[in-house]
Design a protein with these regions (language model features):
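Short, solvent-exposed polar/charged micro-motifs at secondary-structure junctions
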Residues: 15-18, 46, 125, 147-149
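A generic structural signal for short, non-catalytic loop/turn and secondary-structure boundary residues
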Residues: 1-2, 51-53, 76
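An active-site-proximal beta-strand-loop segment
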Residues: 25-31, 41, 67
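Short, flexible, glycine/charge-rich loop motifs used to bind or transfer phosphoryl groups or to couple energy/partner
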Residues: 24-26, 48, 72-73
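Conserved beta-hairpin
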Residues: 19, 32-58
Length: 152
């Protein structure tokens, strides 16, 4: 991981290929903060300079569920944020937990971070647990109605 760097992405459009093309949901969530995993040993050619390759993103934003902000009570509702996208180009060993842990360290404080593992996609939340998230259980089973182009 010595060749990797995690830094905030200021141009949200830079993450679009990850969110819209690679991630299974194919849609943008609410994004307040987004961090990129850059491989300093692999470069993408720009017209003038060589830039480290962006190989993953981790984004945080307001939850689609308004009730989530109240998990810590009225007093702390503005501190709650959801880790809503974790996308890797290659998904090599330890990249996910490295990106999550380094992204969490860069978030403005204080924050209460919540994330969900989509069991319908065979995600078990192991990356989050490896990043010291506290497992609090599963949500109620639900049925998602898919409209055209995979949107809810």
């Amino acid at each position: 991981m010595n060749n990797y760097e995690v830094r905030q992405i200021r141009n949200l459009g830079e993450a679009d290929p990850f969110i819209l093309d690679i991630h299974y949901a194919k849609r943008k969530p609410s994004i307040s903060y987004i961090y990129g995993l850059f491989d300093n040993d692999s470069y993408e050619e720009d017209r003038i300079i060589m830039i480290p390759e962006l190989i993953g993103i981790c984004s945080f934003g307001m939850s689609a569920s308004p009730n989530l902000s109240y998990i810590a009570g009225e007093k702390h509702k503005n501190k709650v944020i959801e880790l809503n996208r974790l996308v890797l180009k290659y998904n090599r060993k330890n990249e996910a937990s490295f990106l999550v842990s380094k992204s969490l360290k860069q978030l403005p404080r204080p924050k209460i971070v919540v994330s969900y593992a989509d069991t319908a996609q065979d995600h078990l939340g192991i990356v989050y647990q490896a990043s010291n998230f506290m497992f609090t259980g599963t949500t109620k089973e639900r049925t998602d109605m898919a409209a055209c182009k995979g949107k809810h």
